[in-house]
C-alpha cells in the first residue's frame, strides 16, 4: 500500500471515530433530557400523593393549609391561571397594576385552594390516563375514589408542558366543569357590575385573602 493510500485509510478511520463520538454525544444528550423531563401523568400522581400525605397527617388545619400552599406554589402556574382568569382586561393594565394583581391573585388563589382541600381527609386520587394535546398541553385523566361519605369524582388536569422539566397545572376540570373558566366568569361578573373598575376586583381579592 502506498503512503498516500495509508494516509487516506488513516483519515477515513479518524473521520469514522469522530462521527461515532458525535453520534454517542447526541444520544447522551437525548438520554439526559429524558431523565430530567417529567411525564405529566407521573407529575400529577406525585402531586396528589404529596397532598394526600399532608391531609392524613396528625397536624393542625393551619399547618396543613401552609403545607398545601407550598405544594401549590411549586406545582401550579398561578400567574398563568391569574391572567387567564382576568380575561381581555389584562391587556389594559399598566405594569404596576399587573404586579399588584399578580400578588393579590396569588394570595387569593392559595387561600381558596388550600382551605377547600384541607377539608378532605386522605383523598385517594387515581391517575387513569393522559391525552397529549400538543407540545404545550397534556390532559391527565384521574378519578377521586368514592367513599361512603362522597361519590367518585372525575378530575381532568390541564398540564402546561412547554418546559418538560417543570410541568405546571393550569386548570382542573371536575366532572366537565373547568375551574379556571368558572373563575374567569366570576371575575368578569365583578368587573361588568362595576363599569370595568379593576380596583373593585383588587378590593374583592384583598378582602377575601384577609378574612
Please tell me what each predicted stretch does:
Residues 20-31:
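Bacterial N-terminal signal peptides
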Residues 152-181:
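Short beta-strand edge/turn micro-motifs at domain boundaries
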Residues 34-37:
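Boundary at the C-terminal end of the N-terminal hydrophobic targeting segment
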Residues 111-153, 204, 208-211:
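Surface-exposed, charged secondary-structure patches
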